[in-house]
Swiss-Prot record:
Belongs to the HDDC2 family. The keyword Secreted does not apply. This is 5'-deoxynucleotidase YGK1. GO terms for molecular function: 5'-deoxynucleotidase activity; GMP 5'-nucleotidase activity; metal ion binding. The gene is YGK1. It comes from Saccharomyces cerevisiae (strain ATCC 204508 / S288c).
Length: 215
């Protein structure tokens, strides 16, 4: 009977980082930062698949999301929590990769891999540095993943909004010749009133741009 290979985060850590972790007294801070560095070099799959070269990295996306959350004016929102959630919401992709709906993987398996990665990073690499950081990062990631708080919902919307902004930037860069309309489907997933307003303003600017190409 053939054994089933189950994906595990620890099996996907680069050799040079494993070398750090295998030392008698591992430098866990360095190992963690080296893993996060992978987000700076991994390109966002959706743009790669549409021939955008060069395109943004996962880290680029999360950084601008974090800054965007600072623009929230809703007084009921803890913006500092939003910033934290934005910074960690995709950090499992450092080992899992940027999986899209076009990839041959179920949503359940994608979630399992990401959750296992977050647990592994928090328990095995971050906790030896800081127990409080380990708990906070896991809690913030779950707040986004499970949408358990207002801040998680705002960051979910800003995830979509930032992608739409990036889409428009690439449409402008390629003078409207790249067909990126499929990314506009994210508009319907935005729930909060404030981010809806941002999106409507963005769409008006986008329409004006495409109208100008017809002149």
């Amino acid at each position: 009977m053939t054994a089933v290979n189950i994906w595990k985060p620890e099996d996907n850590i680069p050799r040079e980082i494993l070398a750090i972790l295998s030392k008698p007294h591992p430098n866990y801070q360095l190992a963690f930062l080296n893993i996060i560095q992978l987000l700076k070099t991994q390109r966002r799959t959706g743009w790669v698949d549409h021939g955008i070269d060069p395109c943004e990295s996962i880290s680029d996306h999360m950084y601008r999301m974090g800054l965007t959350t600072m623009l929230i004016t809703d007084k009921n929102v803890d913006r500092n929590k939003c910033i934290r959630i934005a910074l960690v919401h995709d950090f499992a992709e450092s080992l899992v990769g940027d999986i899209t709906p076009n990839d041959p993987m179920t949503k359940e398996e994608k979630h399992r891999r990401e959750f296992e990665t977050v647990k592994y990073l928090c328990e095995s690499i971050i906790r030896p540095c800081s127990e409080s950081a380990s708990r906070e990062i896991l809690d913030d990631w779950l707040a986004y993943e499970k949408q358990t708080c207002l801040e998680g919902r705002y960051v979910k919307d800003i995830d979509k909004y930032e992608m739409l902004v990036q889409c428009f930037e690439y449409e402008q860069k390629y003078n409207g010749k790249k067909d990126l309309k499929q990314f506009l489907g994210a508009i319907n997933d935005i729930k909060t009133d404030e981010v809806k307003k941002w999106t409507q303003s963005l769409l008006e600017d986008r329409q004006a741009f495409f109208d100008s190409l017809k002149e």
